[in-house]
């Protein structure tokens, strides 16, 4: 497998240098920059598989950058934040980040998260090559290889990697109640923590994109005290 290329976007020089050295030592091809403008230049020229993106950059906001990236790319994104509250984390997931870490972080934990996402990137690419399934539900058509949904009005609804993976879990377990721990493990390969809202945020994102009325969902139902139920699949 070719060396995977990680882009570090961190304005703090010491942290940037440490991350650069650490991931190079783990065998990755690494580019490190300190601004959003530099990040955009690298992305235009290089084949990047994953971005470690600091939320607070001098020339832009990491959350806005994540939203922009997700508009045209399925690249892996891990947000790095210095805040301990959940707001940035939740918003980051809502706009399309794959994961997040809070400073100060353990480099080995960050490495594990990077490996996890890169393995998912590779798995998704392989799945796109081999998966031929199309799923239909409630007037929608989910094209798994293309990782997109044909809307009721004929428009194309694009899915982020995390949304795609969660939807694949749901269509593979139609009419089955899945608890958050099981969903978390299948989508992120981490155990669910009661304070972690990753799955709830992803389900809400799918509801907003796919339900007729996301406030009264019929496809992705909450089973109180247990988890979520996906129903309505016709193929």
Where would I find each of the regions flagged by the language model?
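DNA-binding patch around the recognition helix
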Residues: 125, 132, 158, 201-235
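Short amphipathic alpha-helical recognition elements used for nucleic-acid or partner binding
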Residues: 154-190, 206
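Short, positively charged loop/turn segments that connect secondary-structure elements
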Residues: 190-197
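A structural micro-motif at secondary-structure boundaries
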Residues: 135-164, 192, 223, 229-235
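N-terminal/domain-start alpha-helical segments
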Residues: 1-125
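Short, flexible helix-to-coil linker/hinge segments that flank and couple to helix-turn-helix
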Residues: 118-132, 144-145
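Residues within helix-turn-helix
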Residues: 108, 181, 197
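Hydrophobic recognition helices of helix-based DNA-binding modules
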Residues: 118-121, 170, 210
């Amino acid at each position: 497998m070719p060396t995977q290329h990680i882009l570090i976007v961190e304005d703090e020089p010491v942290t940037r240098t440490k991350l650069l050295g650490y991931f190079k030592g783990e065998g990755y091809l690494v580019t490190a920059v300190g601004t959003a403008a530099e990040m955009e230049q690298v992305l235009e020229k290089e084949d990047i598989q994953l971005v470690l993106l600091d939320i607070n950059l001098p020339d832009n906001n990491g959350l806005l950058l994540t939203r922009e990236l997700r508009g045209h790319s399925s690249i892996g994104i891990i947000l790095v934040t210095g805040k301990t509250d959940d707001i940035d984390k939740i918003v980051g997931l809502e706009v399309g980040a794959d994961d997040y870490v809070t400073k100060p972080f353990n480099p080995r934990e960050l490495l594990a998260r990077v490996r996890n996402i890169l393995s998912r990137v590779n798995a998704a690419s392989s799945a796109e090559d081999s998966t031929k399934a199309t799923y239909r539900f409630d007037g929608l058509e989910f094209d798994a290889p293309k990782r997109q949904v044909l809307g009721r009005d004929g428009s194309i609804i694009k899915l982020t990697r995390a949304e795609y993976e969660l939807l694949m879990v749901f269509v593979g377990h139609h009419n089955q109640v899945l608890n958050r721990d099981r969903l978390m493990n299948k989508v992120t390969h981490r155990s669910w923590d009661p304070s972690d809202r990753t799955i709830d945020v992803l389900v809400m994102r799918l509801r907003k994109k796919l339900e007729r009325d996301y406030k009264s969902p019929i496809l992705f139902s909450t089973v109180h005290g247990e988890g979520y139920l996906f129903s309505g699949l016709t193929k």
